[in-house]
């Protein structure tokens, strides 16, 4: 240990991340927005994994644009790492719950990774342009 005099100890309140996020490839599937939001939700969660922060406040605390926060939240829900229940039908905000890491790895979940989107972008643009020039 580089600094044995300064070993961390658990304070009165703490959050924890399942090590399977690292060892089973989840981190690479999240993308930076979702990873930042997941860390925030874990730190803000109560013992049931629930957090009651609104989207505007989360974005402000994280120092990100609202659209980036929304993209991160959507990715977490898509991968089954977070659940959401709205306060009402007419409000986007509500309760966010950090869920246990699914038993099957992220490669088994539906939806391409952010890297997959980046790799396919040139192909998608080429297909659109070829249709326009016909």
Question: What does each model-identified segment do?
Answer:
Residues 1-32, 47-50, 57-61, 116-131:
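Positively charged, structured surface patches that bind polyanionic biopolymers
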Residues 15, 43, 65-67, 105-107, ...:
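Intrinsic disorder/low-complexity signature
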Residues 24-33, 43-102:
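Winged helix-turn-helix DNA-binding recognition segment
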Residues 36-40:
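Pre-recognition alpha-helix immediately N-terminal to the DNA-recognition helix
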Residues 60, 78, 87, 102-134:
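Short, low-complexity, charged/polar intrinsically disordered tails
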């Amino acid at each position: 240990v580089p600094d044995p005099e300064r070993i961390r100890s658990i304070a009165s309140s703490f959050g924890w991340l399942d090590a399977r996020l690292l060892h089973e490839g989840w981190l690479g599937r999240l993308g930076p927005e979702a990873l930042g939001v997941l860390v925030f939700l874990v730190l803000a969660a109560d013992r049931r994994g629930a957090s009651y922060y609104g989207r505007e406040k989360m974005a402000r605390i994280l120092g990100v644009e609202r659209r980036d926060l929304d993209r991160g939240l959507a990715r977490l829900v898509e991968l089954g790492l977070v659940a959401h229940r709205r306060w009402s039908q007419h409000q986007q905000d509500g309760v966010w719950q950090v869920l246990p890491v699914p038993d099957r790895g992220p490669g088994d979940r539906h939806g391409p990774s952010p890297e997959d989107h980046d790799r396919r972008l040139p192909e998608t643009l080429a297909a659109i342009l070829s249709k326009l020039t016909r």
